[in-house]
Amino acid sequence: MATDAFHVHEEKGDPGRIAIVLPGQAYTAQGPLLSYATHALLDAGWTVRVLIWDVAQPRGAREVYADTLRDSVREHPEARHLVVAKSLGTLALPVASELGMPGAWLTPLLEGPAAPPLRTAIRELVTSGVPTLLAGGTGDSLWSTEHAQASGARVLDIAGADHSLEVPGQWRASLHALGQVTTAVADLASEQATTRRP
């Protein structure tokens, strides 16, 4: 399948801890969820690699996301890896499961045609004991509180939040949700930084 152009921007930190940020289609890494998560990771000393699409509507996203994870592990096999993905970026879930990679999956596609393999991958990650965070909002048609909670993953279920994890017409609730997500990502990263590798 043809893929569109992209590049990976890297902010160097500890070479033994690498976080990979996978944006959505219309939600770039400059969006608040990924931007603040990136700041939290950098503040904690992680090397952060951010995938940036060079087109508005990327083709072949699934393959690009998968290759980005595999390439990072191949290039840095001794490093701890963590993925933070938003929406379309959660198409990388099956490869994360294959690699045993911990992750924070923001607004994962738990409903719709893309959902079945992603739900399976989440269950595989949880069954394997790989730390997995799912964050979504009850106002998002692509999110399923039921499937998220049944998976056994850590779940941040935000009442009334849409696919951007914002609560329409309620800026205070939206800011609170942003803080919850950023804290959850920071906590997950902190755990991975101190967990003994197998």
For the regions a language model picked out, list residue spans one by one.
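Conserved alpha/beta-hydrolase "acid-adjacent" motif
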Residues: 30, 114-115, 136-147, 166
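Active-site nucleophile loop of the alpha/beta-hydrolase fold
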Residues: 24-25, 53-56, 104-113, 137-139
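Catalytic histidine neighborhood in serine/cysteine hydrolases
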Residues: 45-49, 152-167
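Flexible "cap/lid" loop of the alpha/beta hydrolase fold
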Residues: 59-63, 105-129
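Serine-hydrolase catalytic machinery in alpha/beta-hydrolase-like enzymes
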Residues: 1-79, 167
